C-alpha cells in the first residue's frame, strides 16, 4: 500500500490542521513501512475541540431519544457496510491478521453501538412519593463533554465502546486514539458525521498521550475521562482528572489473569482455551489468561497438548485468510516483550517453545515474536508477576483447590479469571472466590455488549458495556414538588 496523505484532526464535523505544528508517524508493524504522517493536537486544539463539543452537545441533548437512536443506528449500518474496508485499515495499522479484524474488531464495536442505540429510549428517571401533598422525581441528565482515551490494541472497537454509551446518554465525546494506531478512529468520526451526528459531538484528536492526553485530563470543560491502557498511565490520568476539576473517571487497565485447569477437566478443551487466552491477537489482549495453573499430575499431558496446538499457529501474510497470528503492534513493544522473555529465561523458567523473534523473508522487517510457552514457572518470577502484553504463556503447577485460589488472587491485578472443570459445583464455588471483574467457566474471552467489563484492584475503576455504563454517563437530578402551602418557621 502506498503512503497515505497526512492525517489531520477531526473537529466540528470535518478535518482541520493542528495548530501545534507537530506530527508523528504511524507504521505497519508487519513490514516496518510508514503508513502516514499524523498531525498531533496541542493545547489550543484541545480548547477548540472542547468549544466545538459544548456547542454540539447542546443540540444533541435537545433531540428526542428516538432521534438520537435513529442516528446511532444509521452509524451502525454504515460500519457494517464498510466492515471490510475498515478491517483492512485496522490490519495495516495494528498488524493484526485480517481474519481477525474482519470478524471481530468492527463487528463487536458495531454491536455495542447498536446495543446502546436501542437503550436510549429506556433511559428514565423515577418518581418517589413522600406524602399526599409532595413527591420527588428524578432526571438522568448528560454530563456534558466527556473524553475518551484509547489503547492501541483494539483501536476502533475501543472508540466505539467509549463513544456509544457516552453519545447515547446525550453527551459529546472528544476521543484521543493511541498515537500507535490512530487511523480508524478518524474514519469513525467520518461515519458518525455521515450518519447525522451534529457537528462537534464526536471530535478526534490524535496526539501523544503525555501531551494531548494530559491537556484533555486537565481541561475544566471536560466532565469525565474514560481511559484504557496501562496501570501507570491510568494512575496519572486519574490524578490529573481529580486535581484539575474532580472529573469522573472510568479506568480499564492491565491484567495478569489466572486460568485454572482442574484435574477433572477435558485437557483438550483446557488446551484450546489456554491457546485463545494467550495467543489470540498475538497476546495483545488485556484480559489474557497468562498464568495457567494446572495440577502437577496433569502438567506433562497438558504441555504436549499445548505444543501440538502451537504448531497449528499460522503466522505470515496478514491478509492471507489462513493467517491467524500477526506481529506485535510496534518495534518498541516487540523489544519490551523480548526483554520479558529474556528475563524469564534468566530467572529459571523453561522454554517449551518460542522465546525468539520469527525469522525469514515474511518476518525480518516486521515486529514479529514467536508464540512462547514457559513452564516450570514460580509465582515470584517477573514473567508471572508483570503484564507482558504479548504471546507469552506461563504454566504453573499446584496441588490443591485452596492453594490455587490463594495463588491466583496473589496479584495487584484483578481484571479477569477463568476455570476449566467438569464439576459445576466447584466451578461456581471457585469463581466466587476469585478476585476478578470478568470471569469465565469452560470458555474464555467473549465480551458481548450486554456484559459489564472492568476489573478489581489495580485493573480499573468502573465498567464498560452493559446497562450500568449508560447510567455512568449521566448525572441524577432530584426535584421535590410540594403541592400544599409552604410552612416557614420564621
Curated annotation (Swiss-Prot):
Cofactor comment: Binds 2 potassium ions per subunit.
The keyword NADP belongs to this UniProt entry's keyword annotation: yes
The EC number(s) this enzyme carries: 1.2.1.8
Residues noted as binding K(+) 1 in the record, renumbered to the chain: 26-27, 93, 180
Cysteine sulfenic acid (-SOH): residues bearing it: 286
Reactions performed catalytically: betaine aldehyde + NAD(+) + H2O = glycine betaine + NADH + 2 H(+)
NCBIfam families in UniProt: BADH, PRK13252.1
Gene Ontology biological-process entries: glycine betaine biosynthetic process from choline
Protein name: Betaine aldehyde dehydrogenase
Enzyme's top EC category: oxidoreductase
Binding site for NAD(+): 150-152, 176-179, 230-233, 254, 286, 387
Entry binding sites for K(+) 2: 246, 457, 460
Pathway: Amine and polyamine biosynthesis; betaine biosynthesis via choline pathway; betaine from betaine aldehyde: step 1/1
Keywords carried by this UniProt record: Metal-binding, NAD, NADP, Oxidation, Oxidoreductase, Potassium
Site (Seems to be a necessary countercharge to the potassium cations): residue numbering on this chain: 248
Signal sequence bounds: none
Quaternary structure, from the entry: Dimer of dimers.
The keyword Oxidoreductase appears for this protein: yes
Function noted in UniProt: Involved in the biosynthesis of the osmoprotectant glycine betaine. Catalyzes the irreversible oxidation of betaine aldehyde to the corresponding acid.
SUPFAM superfamilies per the UniProt record, alphabetical: ALDH-like
Organism superkingdom: Bacteria
GO MF annotations, alphabetized: betaine-aldehyde dehydrogenase (NAD+) activity; metal ion binding
